[in-house]
């Protein structure tokens, strides 16, 4: 499961719908196996579009839980066109590419901060199915 995916998953227990603690899910870095896939091509245009859509505080929270405390506290801002990007902008985009797209969680657990339900990640696939008593 790509790191970027962590920014779009929330607890699906019905009782958690009204809670602000259902997103982001909590990741225990000691139980998560991270892998790097360097075969994914760097695409600055895609990253410019996706950075606007990510919830930056959630990115910071999950990254810290997985052991990365090097991210800036505020979301980086970029010019609207690729032609206006500076070398520093490209370096930041490259780092975001490595984190968001090349970093994946192969095995591990995600836990709801509200109800405590644990979702397992196996072979890079999160199991978001709920037992009948939680639906």
From Swiss-Prot:
GO BP: any one term: rRNA (guanine-N7)-methylation
Source domain of life: Eukaryota
Domain TRM112: 2-131
Entry's Gene Ontology molecular function annotations: protein heterodimerization activity; tRNA methyltransferase activator activity
GO cellular component terms listed in the entry, alphabetical order: cytoplasm; cytosol; eRF1 methyltransferase complex; nucleolus; nucleus; ribosome; tRNA (m2G10) methyltransferase complex; tRNA methyltransferase complex
Keyword line: Cytoplasm, Nucleus
Location(s), subcellular: Cytoplasm; Nucleus
InterPro entries given in the database record: Trm112, Trm112-like
Keyword Signal: no
Function: Acts as an activator of both rRNA/tRNA and protein methyltransferases. Together with methyltransferase MTQ2, required for the methylation of eRF1 on 'Gln-182'. Together with methyltransferase TRM11, required for the formation of 2-methylguanosine at position 10 (m2G10) in tRNA. Together with methyltransferase BUD23, required for the formation of 7-methylguanine at position 1575 (m7G1575) in 18S rRNA. Involved in biogenesis of both 40S and 60S ribosomal subunits.
Family label: Belongs to the TRM112 family.
Record note on quaternary structure: Heterodimer of MTQ2-TRM112, forming the eRF1 methyltransferase. TRM112 is necessary for the solubility and activity of the catalytic subunit MTQ2. Interacts with TRM11; required for full tRNA methyltransferase activity. Interacts with BUD23; required for full rRNA methyltransferase activity. Interacts with RCM1, NOP2, TRM9 and LYS9.
Anything else known: Present with 4800 molecules/cell in log phase SD medium.
Identification of the protein by name: Multifunctional methyltransferase subunit TRM112
UniProt gene name: TRM112
